[in-house]
């Protein structure tokens, strides 16, 4: 297994799909990384030489991924909470942040229903 950005990349998958195992890299970004590294998208990871894997590592290293990205997202949410702005309040109350309706939906964000005690 190739190790890129601290993650073991699956050998049996195509390069584009295998790179999406890294947090912060989706299909579009993985296609751009493969193109920049000069690697065909349909080549499997186990078929790549060590030089090609090093090129992939260099290209992935140009982006914020994995732990750094998770930390950045967490700090962004913490900043909103500290500011006390509307979005921060919505995060604090575990409600949808981006203007979705909450009268009927938003069960995922609000959690299971709480029965009303009489």
Swiss-Prot record:
GO molecular function: rRNA binding; structural constituent of ribosome; tRNA binding
UniProt signal peptide: none
Annotated GO biological process: translation
Cellular component GO terms held in the UniProt record: cytosol; small ribosomal subunit
Spans annotated as Disordered: 94-118
Pfam families in alphabetical order: Ribosomal_S13
Keywords annotated in UniProt: Ribonucleoprotein, Ribosomal protein, RNA-binding, rRNA-binding, tRNA-binding
Biological role: Located at the top of the head of the 30S subunit, it contacts several helices of the 16S rRNA. In the 70S ribosome it contacts the 23S rRNA (bridge B1a) and protein L5 of the 50S subunit (bridge B1b), connecting the 2 subunits; these bridges are implicated in subunit movement. Contacts the tRNAs in the A and P-sites.
Family from the record: Belongs to the universal ribosomal protein uS13 family.
Summary of subunit composition and partner proteins: Part of the 30S ribosomal subunit. Forms a loose heterodimer with protein S19. Forms two bridges to the 50S subunit in the 70S ribosome.
HAMAP family referenced in this protein's UniProt entry, alphabetically: Ribosomal_uS13 (MF_01315)
Name of this protein: Small ribosomal subunit protein uS13
